[in-house]
Amino acid sequence: MVFFIFLLLCVGRLFFIQFFRSSYLTSIAKKQHNQLVELEPRRGTIYDCNLKAQAFNMSMDSLYAVPGEIKGKENVINQLNSILGLKRSYLEDRLNRKKSFIWLARKLNPDKSATIKKLNIKGLGFLKETKRIYPNSYLASHIIGFSGMDNIGLEGVERDYNRHLKGIPGWAIFLRDARQKKLDIWEKMVVPVDGEDLVLTIDEVIQYIAERELDKAFKDFHAKGASIIVMDPHTGRILALANRPTYDLNDHSEVSKDSMRNRAICDLFEPGSVFKIVTASGALEEKKVTEEDVFFCENGTYKVGGRILHDHMPHGLLTFRQVIEESSNIGTVKVAQLLGPDKLYHYVRAFGFGSKLGIDLSGEISGMISPPKLWSKTSITSIPMGQEVGVTALQLASAISVIANGGQLMKPYIIDSVRDIQGRLIKQNKPVLIHKVISIDTAMRIKKILTGVIEEGTGKLAKVSGFSAAGKTGTAQKLEPNGTYSHNKFVASFIGFSPAEDPILTIVVIVDEPHPSYFGGVVAAPVFQKVASDAIRYIKGNELPLEALAR
């Protein structure tokens, strides 16, 4: 009887398990014998405009441990400490945890990975992960940026276009044997979706030329910082953009925030005399002056609006053309007085100052220009020559392009297109006209004057051998914290385009706090000259710089 009752209970228990608890117990068993593994998608490649890879993925070994399987942990810790340089305390902590899987080191150098594999230590294993590689290290670092350990973009277009580049992870359920060892068989799998590729507007060779010359000026003049932009004036395409200081995209763990800052789009400064192109363009467009109108430049000293203006060298009578060629502050202010505050402000804004231009890089700032109702009595004597206004290098590049292209403000852009892994086009960026600024006639007349700046005026060191060029020098005193202008801190600049008659590119060079020399015509103009010379020859197919060819 007792046996019968026991048998009945067993049958009842089996019936309960079979029909009421089977799904629960099956899930428990699967958890013990299956492992869900995320499958990493391929992160998209970043190319220059000629489809030369600037960032791509490489398969690397990542080292993991199953702590319970490792014997002689002290010896293993010593070996890994020697090979990987990891702290003993870190290894001791990881290897003494009660886990079935724990990372020790990810995306290893192939030599280190091979050395550990030769040791054949039970309880250590490797999984393939992808590491982001930047083949040109420092080149275009402030454009490209970088991604982190988990291939998530952290800076530059790597961050701004992460949703395009990252792809969609897949997953697989791998079977395990009775000892919990993963078998190379899966029960279910969802294939990852690869990320999309980015094609930039920059040209690797022009970028190299620009960085080479900027780096030389930055070091030769012991500068605090420097920026350069090379742009197609007709479209707004950025052909090169660089800053100093910079950093290595493959080794950014110890980089300062100052080195990572994209100064060309986020640093605000008073432009000084390069800003005179706005005053000059507005005066010609409004028919307030002609090229041959004469201005008395007060022999270098002029008391006006409660302040005293000085020219860097005394001038008497100068034509309007000569006022710009010789960069006369006094002459420029007299021209601005003819134009008036409201019209001057109109042209400052029309040239793109005081608002964001909309470049497809994060961090752009709008700059600073107050409306006339907030001007002081000295503003009409300051703004025309680039004081009381804050600008970026990008805004100057777009502004000088207005003169180069016949009067149009173009939206600058850095992304040419987005493509899938097969190269099929997903998105194509095209030139965008923001608005018309001045007439073609005014642009042509200013172009001739700016050609004279290089031929006869302050920009002689910007003269490009074999090609005509036009441009404007700038030497701006920096503001001290107390609001006064410094006598030993300057921003040297040059903005220009070449060839003058049919411009291929515009170039802006900004050097912050150079010394001992600080004049734009001495510090920045030679950078323009060398970049324009080499870049135009490269574009025309006449000559490739030897250094670029070697690369």
Language-model segments: residues:
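Periplasmic/cell-envelope proteins involved in peptidoglycan metabolism and beta-lactam response
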Residues: M1-H252, L268, D342-G354, G363, ...
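Beta-lactam-recognizing serine transpeptidase/beta-lactamase-like catalytic domain environment
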Residues: A53-A55, R176-E187, I228-S273, V278-E513, ...
